[in-house]
A protein has these predicted regions:
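Active-site-proximal helices and loops of the catalytic beta/alpha 8
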Residues: 12-264
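Glycine-rich phosphate-binding "P-loop"
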Residues: 1-11, 16
């Protein structure tokens, strides 16, 4: 009962002990378990480097509301409010490029649409990361320890496609360790084999993000978002004259018409 002061003080004391041990940030599991105002109180008291909540919901507005709710704890700075895992972006990407390995009557439970139009939200990015003022609070991901066994799980060549998106776009991207290191992992009777992993592809994408300065505030101009093709230009910031990255995902061909000196 987080309305109980004894419980509140106990949580704050525990977080203080974790910081003393060297922990820098908090990941809140099952963030729907109690009101976000209490997360705000705990964050304000402990001042982590970063905080992210697992509010498992594919609706970007509901994720925004949860983040906003953490302000109600009396937090005065946006640097201390909690972020949230961007399940809205996760499910949007999954529906585009993932065909389920789970079937019912021989039919996959989810079929990839290969239509990227849902990544264009009236000219802006889709998902929580595309909401004005929330990109620095949107922790984008391709899979995690729960989703990797679900029907929406990314497998095979779909994995680098998804990272090509989140690692070149605004948000706070994170990498699922099995995708990076490879190997077999089992949960709930489901086993996924990631072979030798995708470290080479992921390292290249992380290097691009770092060297070009792409960040949560970077500017995205979507050139194409349609069946078979997603293409966008990324500027380090909206005030920059030229894009630093051109991204193309999907089977259809596309050539950048903006910028010069592109390296594939």
């Amino acid at each position: 009962d987080h309305t109980n002061l004894t419980v509140q003080n106990g949580v704050k004391d525990f977080l203080s002990r974790l910081k003393a041990l060297g922990f820098k940030g908090w990941r809140w599991d099952v963030a729907k378990g109690f009101a976000p105002v209490y997360f705000g109180n705990y964050i304000q008291a402990s001042q982590p480097y970063y905080s992210v909540g697992e509010n498992w919901d594919g609706n970007a507005t509901k994720l925004k509301n949860w983040i906003d709710g953490t302000y109600a704890g009396g937090i005065n700075s946006s640097t201390t409010v909690s972020g949230a895992f961007d399940f809205s972006t996760y499910y949007t990407l999954s529906k585009i490029i993932v065909t389920s390995t789970e079937t019912k009557d021989g039919i996959p439970l989810q079929m990839a649409t290969n239509n990227f139009s849902s990544l264009n939200n009236s000219g802006s990015m889709a998902g929580l990361a595309g909401q004005f003022g929330y990109a620095e609070k949107a922790v984008t991901f391709v899979d995690n320890h729960d989703t990797f066994v679900g029907k929406e799980a990314f497998l095979g060549n779909n994995i680098p496609k998804a990272y090509a998106y989140i690692l070149t776009h605004p948000g706070i991207p994170c990498v699922f360790a099995p995708h990076y290191y490879g190997g077999s992992y089992t949960k709930d009777g489901v086993t996924r084999n990631y072979g030798t992993g995708y470290a080479t592809d992921i390292n290249k994408l992380m290097a691009i993000r770092k060297t070009t300065g792409i960040n949560a505030y970077s500017n995205v101009t979507i050139d194409r978002a349609e069946a078979g093709l997603y293409a966008a230009y990324i500027k380090k910031s909206a005030s920059d004259a030229e894009p630093v990255v051109a991204v193309k995902i999907g089977p259809y061909s596309w050539t950048p018409s903006l910028g010069t000196g592109w390296i594939l």
